[in-house]
């Protein structure tokens, strides 16, 4: 081999080896040296992404118990603490549900269909002695929770929606303290607003007291997985050493907001429309909004994005759970698709639903018949445009039969129908009306006067019906010719109109006499047979 190649390979391997040694030394001596930086639990510890600093082991809990004088607590508070620790051991938090893994496929489909209406706070499990009621999905009313040591917490049914938020990487919600009595009447009244993991002992613990949870308490304390100080320890007056007062105390009409940045796992708190502080970073577990009360009745209203936020930045950047108004800001599979904007022409051009409306015009019902037994399609008014005259549509056979049954007319060819109506004088219109009535009622009265033979052969009956049909056809022909003559000549005097009427009556009399003669001959033939 060429010695130059061997030398090049040796130099390359030595450089790579030196780089590996340098990187390993940097990770050992420099990694995580900053005290303010949060470290993460690796796969060897619970396999989750939770800040190690806020997790309490048994040694830390014993230290907290001794620090806050656990032995001098009331029996109820001691029992609540021991019961909470037992619940955590038997039902540990599911730290594997990270970055939206708590959502199943069915949950994702439900959020697509219902949007923000899919979120609601869970009702109290004890229906008979319920301590709170959830109204309108996001209004929580604690009404039977004013007894000593009574504790209850309501949790949202779904965790924070952190998936498929490409353009809005922050989830935010606000809670308004609608009603809360605090003072001499209720000195131990206490509530907490925050985030918890499931399962959580909501029947007897407030948010922030068990792993893993965080809460903003009404006394101003910030609780992160710490069972101490207890609520009663925080109500020992202004000189109490347990009131840290990290945050401003909460009262009625205050609005508390919690935000979560999906990309960095940062949790922050707002109060009355102003950002207060960032609580932690690097928390990627699925958290559920929760509201709890201790020995007090209160009413809370939670805003998940269905209304405008008090914190203006959340409105501008669309930090709500699911955006219904601006789907483009929160792109992805979750959320409701925006309805077509009918007022915007640029949007309507590319909308397939609106384009189909032009291709498929609606079918309106047929117009009603006028006094003369014709629809508006058969009438051609003088002065109408040529376009409207050309727009004539043929009726189907069923429609023709229905019209003929309604009018009581026999079938007449459409060529013989008069479709032109002009501004004729009243005398001509009266004549038209009389002729039309005679045309309708005449054949019926004649046929009814000449009854069909009750007893006879089939030939005699057929001859009778043939004669009746010929009589009606001749009658129709005569009346139509007379009507055409009247409309063409347009008589200007009443004398001409009376003459036309007399001629018509004479014609009808002659036709009747002819029919009677024919019928008599036919009856004589039948008798001879």
From Swiss-Prot:
Ranges of Basic residues composition bias in the record: 511-529
Gene giving rise to this polypeptide: SSH4
Protein role: Components of the endosome-vacuole trafficking pathway that regulates nutrient transport. May be involved in processes which determine whether plasma membrane proteins are degraded or routed to the plasma membrane.
Protein's GO biological process: protein transport
Any Pfam family the entry gives: SPRY
Organism encoding this protein: Debaryomyces hansenii (strain ATCC 36239 / CBS 767 / BCRC 21394 / JCM 1990 / NBRC 0083 / IGC 2968) (Yeast)
Listed InterPro entries: B30.2/SPRY, B30.2/SPRY_sf, ConA-like_dom_sf, SPRY_dom, SPRY_Ssh4-like
Cytoplasmic compartment spans: 1-2
Key words of the record: Endosome, Glycoprotein, Membrane, Protein transport, Signal-anchor, Transmembrane, Transmembrane helix, Transport, Vacuole
Biased composition (Polar residues): 383-398, 457-476, 492-504
TM region(s), chain numbering: 3-23
UniProt name for this protein: Protein SSH4
């Amino acid at each position: 081999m060429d010695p130059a190649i061997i030398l090049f390979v040796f130099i390359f391997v030595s450089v790579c080896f030196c780089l590996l040694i340098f990187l390993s030394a940097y990770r050992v001596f420099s990694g995580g040296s900053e005290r303010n930086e949060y470290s993460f639990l690796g796969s060897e510890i619970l396999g989750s992404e939770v800040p190690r600093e806020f997790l309490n082991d048994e040694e830390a809990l014993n230290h907290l118990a001794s620090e806050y004088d656990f032995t001098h607590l009331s029996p109820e508070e001691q029992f609540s603490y021991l019961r909470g620790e037992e619940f955590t051991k038997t039902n540990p938090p599911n730290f594997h549900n990270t970055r939206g893994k708590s959502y199943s496929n069915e949950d994702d489909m439900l959020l697509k269909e219902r949007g923000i209406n899919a979120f609601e706070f869970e009702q109290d499990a004890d229906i008979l002695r319920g301590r709170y009621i959830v109204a309108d999905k996001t209004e929580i009313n604690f009404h039977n929770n004013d007894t000593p040591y009574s504790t209850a917490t309501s949790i949202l049914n779904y965790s924070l929606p952190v998936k498929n938020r490409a353009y809005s990487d922050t989830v935010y919600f606000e809670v308004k303290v609608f009603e809360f009595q605090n003072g001499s009447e209720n000195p131990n009244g206490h509530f907490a607003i925050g985030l918890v993991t499931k399962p959580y002992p909501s029947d007897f613990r407030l948010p922030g007291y068990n792993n893993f949870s965080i809460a903003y308490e009404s006394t101003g304390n910030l609780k992160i997985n710490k069972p101490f100080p207890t609520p009663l320890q925080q109500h020992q007056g202004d000189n109490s050493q347990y009131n840290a007062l990290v945050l401003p105390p909460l009262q009625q009409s205050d609005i508390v907001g919690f935000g979560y940045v999906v990309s960095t796992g940062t949790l922050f708190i707002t109060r009355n429309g102003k950002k207060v502080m960032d609580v932690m970073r690097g928390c990627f577990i699925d958290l559920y909004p929760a509201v709890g009360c201790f020995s007090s009745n209160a009413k809370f209203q939670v805003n998940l994005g269905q209304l405008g936020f008090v914190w203006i930045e959340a409105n501008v950047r669309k930090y709500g759970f699911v955006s219904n108004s601006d789907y483009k800001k929160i792109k992805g599979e979750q959320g409701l698709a925006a309805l077509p904007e009918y007022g915007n022409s640029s949007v309507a051009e590319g909308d397939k639903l609106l384009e189909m409306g032009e291709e498929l015009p609606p079918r309106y019902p047929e117009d009603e018949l006028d006094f003369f037994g014709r629809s508006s399609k058969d009438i051609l008014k003088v002065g109408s445009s040529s376009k409207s005259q050309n727009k004539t549509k043929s009726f189907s056979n069923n429609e023709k039969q229905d019209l003929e049954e309604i009018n009581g007319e026999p079938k007449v060819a459409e060529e013989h129908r008069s479709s032109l109506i002009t501004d004729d004088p009243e005398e001509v219109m009266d004549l038209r009306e009389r002729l039309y009535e005679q045309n309708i009622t005449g054949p019926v009265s004649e046929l009814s006067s000449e009854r069909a033979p009750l007893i006879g052969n089939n030939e005699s009956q057929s001859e009778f019906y043939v004669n009746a049909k010929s009589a009606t056809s001749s009658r129709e022909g005569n009346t139509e010719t007379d009507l055409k003559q009247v409309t063409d000549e347009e008589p200007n005097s009443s004398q001409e109109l009376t003459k036309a009427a007399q001629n018509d009556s004479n014609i009808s009399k002659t036709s009747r006499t002819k029919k009677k003669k024919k019928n008599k001959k036919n009856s004589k033939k039948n008798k001879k047979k």
